[in-house]
From Swiss-Prot:
The lineage of its organism: Eukaryota, Metazoa, Chordata, Craniata, Vertebrata. Residues 273-678 form the USP domain. The keyword rRNA-binding does not apply. Deubiquitinase that plays a key regulatory role in the spindle assembly checkpoint or mitotic checkpoint by preventing premature anaphase onset. Acts by specifically mediating deubiquitination of CDC20, a negative regulator of the anaphase promoting complex/cyclosome (APC/C). Deubiquitination of CDC20 leads to stabilize the MAD2L1-CDC20-APC/C ternary complex (also named mitotic checkpoint complex), thereby preventing premature activation of the APC/C. Promotes association of MAD2L1 with CDC20 and reinforces the spindle assembly checkpoint. This is Ubiquitin carboxyl-terminal hydrolase 44. Expressed in testis. Expressed at high levels in T-cell acute lymphoblastic leukemia. The gene is USP44.
Length: 712
């Protein structure tokens, strides 16, 4: 890349005080919301995409005449007046300091020094980043509330406009005439029921003593109760007459409530909640949206909250001496046990606040609570998923900022710490692996402190997490010399599908050639010849003694992979990135055709075909993760998810969610495909135990109480 040594416009640059280059939450285009090729204007707070995306940064220059912009990921500086990249700095050295600060923010390492010898800690007081600041969290809290309010207002206005138009249309007039007579009948029935209720109450009141004396008697007794109750613990019981009146009025109210056809409805469709991009976190947002829309996975974590038993055991152990209390040492050991394979130990904080950027306030209306860190010293991804899903499926928020989820990921999966762009497939594998380890550790550590019901629930959820994506492959190697077949069973949690050979070389005409996911599955299960005589066949070497001096017989062989056990949720990872050169990975940008329904029967072994019914091979598309961009280390992730509550597809682009059709989904450039088995091997459509299905459809009503306890 050629660049200018000197640019007079950079030399004249005065860095704006409100520039957005150091704010990871603003590293997305304000117009199209992409996180690929993001340029921050250094003369104002504007952030937009480059000319190879939608040219929104160029349009900003044409409108504002601000010439200098910084690419926040690669840290290039570009001058639009010179139309070239520049290398020089201004007299105060702002660009050099910006680059060093950006590197510190991305890596979350603030221990490098400036020219004056001071530590570079401008973005945080501790080891965590800008998003942990109270001011930033309060600002995003207000923005989340405002976004939801505006979304609700637009929805109401659009509904009024549509109803006005529909009532004036011929179809609308016909619809209004049909139920007119039915409405009259319903009104008459309601009026009759109300009159009967009034007569009943009136008859009960007439059979009691006069209302005046009753009122005076009740007033006198209530006054005595109010005065005496301050000094005497026991309250004077009210008169039977008054109790009867109160019970009658309560019955009347409950009857009216039950008769009322008006029910509380969620503000938004449950699940249609955007996740704010906290700084190149589109990979995390797309994966979380997909997992929350998988019915089985969501119901498990709506039901399970690991922090509940931690709090309960901690309080119970202070009362009894049967077991030692859950101390900091115990919690630290559990965290250390979780991280022993990765060598990363979570640091303990002395004061921690609440769990997610979402929650409930008093009453029905929920308020987002922006925490610094999770609520417990035991950092739990399961707890953060539980809390996040509670808010996303409460039907109350159009946008939520998953601060605590990102914080927990940073602590427990250190490879994803910082604001660098990451791969969604790698994050999904690491997240599921960490969740599985956490459930196993929690279920086996300190079993005496965990209630039996909670241990049973943890075991059930662990069983679902282990089996929802788990399948088995039959690896069959055939010796070409004696035709002996050697079978090996291998587990899998996803199928990584390679593109056919014609897409493995660079060329301009490759992108125009069609490719189908069924073709990639056929390539995955096709017979592959092993190169040369490299196979040690047991049959050919059976006559050779174990300690014989004769050489081992090597033969030619062929290998084939077939599916012998189908998972309930099938993950297909399309290997779009290939190595080009020594250190470069380029993307295969060809469109892969896929259907809403997938039949896996052609890719299974014979034994599986005989043991399963035909409908067990049918899968329905549930979600699609897309990668926008050209390179492995850059780009933007979005997801298409099927919302079972609303019965429609939704495109999840960080904070922006929009309904879409199946045709739009099938046109997407898929990176990860999620298919759900229509009927399981047991003949059921769900893998969940009845205990998990009970009362966990969606937390519209429960979120007001349970979320308030968790998040406040």
């Amino acid at each position: 890349m050629l660049a200018m040594d000197t640019c007079k416009h950079v030399g004249q640059l005065q860095l704006a005080q409100d520039h957005s280059s150091l704010n990871p939450q603003k590293w997305h285009c304000v117009d199209c919301n992409t996180t690929e090729s993001i340029w921050a204007c250094l003369s104002c707070s504007h952030v937009a995409c480059g000319r190879y995306i939608e040219e929104h940064a160029l349009k900003h220059f044409q409108e504002s005449s601000h010439p200098v912009a910084l690419e926040v990921n690669e840290m290039y500086v570009f001058c639009y007046l010179c139309d070239d990249y520049v290398l020089n700095d201004n007299t105060t050295g702002d660009l050099k300091l910006l680059r060093r600060t950006l590197s510190a923010i991305k890596s979350q390492n603030y221990h490098c020094t400036t020219r004056s010898g001071r530590f570079l800690r401008s973005m945080g007081t501790g080891d965590d980043s800008y998003f942990l600041h109270d001011g930033a969290q309060s600002l995003l809290q207000s923005e989340d509330q405002l976004y939801t309010a505006l979304w609700h207002r637009r929805r109401i206005l659009m509904g009024k406009i549509f109803r006005t138009w529909f009532e004036q249309s011929p179809i609308g007039r016909k619809k209004q005439e049909e139920p007119f007579q039915e409405k009259i009948v319903v009104k008459r029935e309601v009026k009759k029921r109300r009159q009967e209720l009034e007569y009943q109450v009136k008859a009960e009141l007439e059979s009691m003593p006069p209302r005046k004396s009753l009122r005076l008697q009740g007033l006198a007794q209530s006054t005595i109760i109010e005065i005496v109750s301050v000094q005497v613990p026991a309250q004077t019981p009210a008169s039977p007459a008054k109790d009867k009146v109160l019970s009658t009025s309560e019955n009347e109210i409950s009857q009216k409530v039950s008769d009322s056809s008006v029910k509380r409805r969620p503000i938004v469709t449950p699940g249609v909640t955007g996740l704010r991009n906290l700084g190149n976190t589109c990979y995390m947002n797309s994966v979380l949206q997909v997992l929350s829309h998988l019915l089985i996975f969501r119901q498990c974590f709506l039901k399970l909250d690991l922090n509940q038993w931690l709090a309960m055991t901690a309080s119970e152990k202070t009362r009894s001496c049967k077991h030692p209390p859950v101390t900091d040492t115990v919690v630290y050991q559990m965290n250390e046990c979780q991280e022993k394979d990765t060598g990363f130990v979570c640091s303990r904080q002395s004061s921690l606040s609440s769990g997610l950027s979402g929650g409930a306030s008093k009453g029905r209306k929920m308020e987002l609570i922006q925490p610094k860190e999770p609520t417990s010293q035991y950092i739990s991804l399961c707890h953060e998923l539980h809390t996040l899903f509670q808010v996303m499926w409460s039907g109350k928020w159009a946008l939520v900022s998953p601060f605590a989820m990102l914080h927990s990921v940073w602590r427990l999966i250190p490879a994803f710490r910082g604001y660098a762009q990451q791969d969604a497939q790698e994050f999904l594998c690491e997240l599921l692996d960490k969740i599985q380890r956490e459930l196993e550790t929690t279920g086996t550590s300190l079993p005496a402190l965990i209630p039996t019901s909670q241990r049973k629930l943890i075991k059930q959820v662990l069983n679902v997490v282990n089996n929802i994506f788990h399948g088995q492959l039959l690896s069959q190697v055939t010796c070409l010399a004696c035709d002996n077949k050697s079978n090996t069973i291998e587990p899998f949690w996803d199928l990584s599908l390679e593109f056919p050979e014609r897409y493995q070389c660079s060329g301009k005409d490759i992108a125009s050639q069609p490719c189908l996911v069924t073709e990639m599955l056929a390539k995955f299960t096709e017979t592959e010849a092993l190169e040369g005589k490299i196979y040690v066949c047991d049959q050919c070497n059976s006559k050779r003694r174990r300690f014989s001096s004769k050489p081992v017989v090597l033969t030619e062989a062929q290998k084939q992979l077939m599916i012998c056990h189908l998972p309930q949720v099938l993950r297909l990872h399309l290997k779009r990135f290939r190595w080009s050169g020594r250190n470069n990975r380029e993307k295969i940008g060809v469109h892969v055709g896929f259907e809403e329904i997938l039949n896996m029967e052609p890719y299974c072994c014979r034994e599986t075909l005989k043991s399963l019914r035909p409908e067990c091979f049918i899968y329905d598309l549930s979600a699609v993760v897309m990668h926008h961009g050209k390179g492995f280390g850059s780009g933007h992730y979005t997801a298409y998810c099927y919302n079972s509550e609303g019965g429609f597809w939704v495109h999840c682009n960080d904070s922006k969610l929009s309904m879409c059709t199946m045709d739009e989904v099938c046109k997407a450039q898929a990176y990860i495909l999620f298919y759900t088995q229509r009927v399981t091997e047991n003949g059921h459509s769900k893998l969940l135990p009845p205990e998990l299905l009970l009362g966990s459809q969606h937390p519209n009503e429960d979120a007001d109480t349970s979320s308030n306890e968790i998040l406040s």
